[in-house]
Amino acid sequence: MNDVITAEFDENGRAIRRIRSFVRRQGRLTKGQQLALDEYWPLMGVEFTPEALDLPTLFGREAPVVLEIGFGMGASLVAMAQQHPERDFLGIEVHSPGVGACLSSAHEAGVNNLRVMCHDAVEVLERMIPDASLDMVQLFFPDPWHKARHHKRRIVQSAFAGRIRGKLKISGVFHMATDWENYAEHMLEVMNHAPGYRNLSDDNTYVPRPDSRPVTKFELRGQRLGHGNWDLMFERVE
């Protein structure tokens, strides 16, 4: 696998430092995760390149495409791929242990409608995802960066909302979920002011958790800690 970020330099050759929504940490791979990377990455892994993907070629068919950003260990992503064989799923995660775990689960489940990447999702969106190509984008339980001085690291910002809109088809949906109330409020504020979207909530706030979203590890952890859960769904309308 390539590095999770691409080095960028200005005209004077100085490295450009982007504000990123994640901290780079490799983590230790279990034997099973390493085996999955060795065995199944060639089948389901997608390397980062600065060229747009041909999604029908990638999956070998024309089908609705769901992009999930930050799939963690991949359990819910694999479950959705199992439940919806009529859709194709592309998952992005920056931490290789999670990618290995997802590949292992996908192989055990026998799914063939799932591909994964190990790279910065913002770079993937900028370089590899064609405009108006996605039926849904999922962002479940991203890092809330709860300290005020770190709020600039939150992935849901105005520019990000605009980038997602450009990649969604008309009527495509951006589905977010968080167990951090302040982040939910931040997401709602950003998205309600983002042009070209319609909030699918009846009262212009949050939607009930749809049955289509499996309960994630982070959601269960939040429930044990007494946290609530907030789902937001916004449709691209223009």
Curated annotation (Swiss-Prot):
Lineage of origin: Bacteria, Pseudomonadati, Pseudomonadota, Gammaproteobacteria, Enterobacterales
A Pfam family hit: Methyltransf_4
Entry-linked InterPro entries: SAM-dependent_MTases_sf, tRNA_(Gua-N-7)_MeTrfase_Trmb, tRNA_methyltr_TrmB_bact
Active-site residue numbers: D143
SUPFAM superfamilies referenced in this protein's UniProt entry, alphabetically: S-adenosyl-L-methionine-dependent methyltransferases
MF GO annotations: tRNA (guanine(46)-N7)-methyltransferase activity
UniProt source species: Edwardsiella ictaluri (strain 93-146)
Catalytic reaction equation(s): guanosine(46) in tRNA + S-adenosyl-L-methionine = N(7)-methylguanosine(46) in tRNA + S-adenosyl-L-homocysteine
Name of the protein described by the UniProt record: tRNA (guanine-N(7)-)-methyltransferase
Membrane-spanning intervals of the chain: none
EC numbers for this chain: 2.1.1.33
Family (UniProt): Belongs to the class I-like SAM-binding methyltransferase superfamily. TrmB family.
